[in-house]
UniProtKB/Swiss-Prot annotation:
Gene Ontology cellular component list: cytosol; small ribosomal subunit
Protein name in UniProt: Small ribosomal subunit protein uS13
Keyword tRNA-binding: yes
Highest taxon of source: Bacteria
Source species: Geobacter sulfurreducens (strain ATCC 51573 / DSM 12127 / PCA)
Any GO molecular function: rRNA binding
Function: Located at the top of the head of the 30S subunit, it contacts several helices of the 16S rRNA. In the 70S ribosome it contacts the 23S rRNA (bridge B1a) and protein L5 of the 50S subunit (bridge B1b), connecting the 2 subunits; these bridges are implicated in subunit movement. Contacts the tRNAs in the A and P-sites.
Protein family membership: Belongs to the universal ribosomal protein uS13 family.
Region annotation Disordered: where it falls in the sequence: 97-122
Gene giving rise to this polypeptide: rpsM
Length: 122
């Protein structure tokens, strides 16, 4: 079983898809990793040689920020915005959409389930 960046990659999937189970690695990044390390994208995870796993692991450690480090950076960026008190930080603090979406209707993902307001009629 291949273990990279603290994640056990699924055995029966192609390595190109299996790498996307790591937070911070999508399809494009996975393809770039495999091209740089010279590993075939069609290889199944359980068919990888230990040397290929080591090459992939080394490349990710040296060149990419993934999993815990990336999650920490994202949360620190959001915390910095909230501490600054800028518009984006205020929207994060209030739990509202940050990027200019409408909130009169929709925005239920950020706002949570609808709460009925007493005495309000359409």
């Amino acid at each position: 079983m291949a273990r990279i960046a603290g994640i056990d990659l699924p055995r029966n999937k192609r390595i190109e898809i299996a790498l996307t189970y790591i937070f911070g690695i999508g399809r494009t990044t996975a393809q770039r990793i495999l091209a740089e390390t010279g590993v075939s994208a069609d290889t199944r995870t359980d068919n990888l040689a230990e040397s290929e796993v080591a090459k992939i692991r080394d490349y990710i450690d040296k060149n990419l920020k993934v999993e815990g480090d990336l999650r920490r950076d994202v949360s620190m960026d959001i915390k910095r915005l909230m501490d600054l008190g800028c518009y984006r930080g205020l929207r994060h603090r209030k739990g509202l959409p940050v990027r200019g979406q409408r909130t009169k209707t929709n925005a239920r993902t950020r706002k949570g389930p609808a709460r009925t307001v007493a005495g309000k009629k359409k």
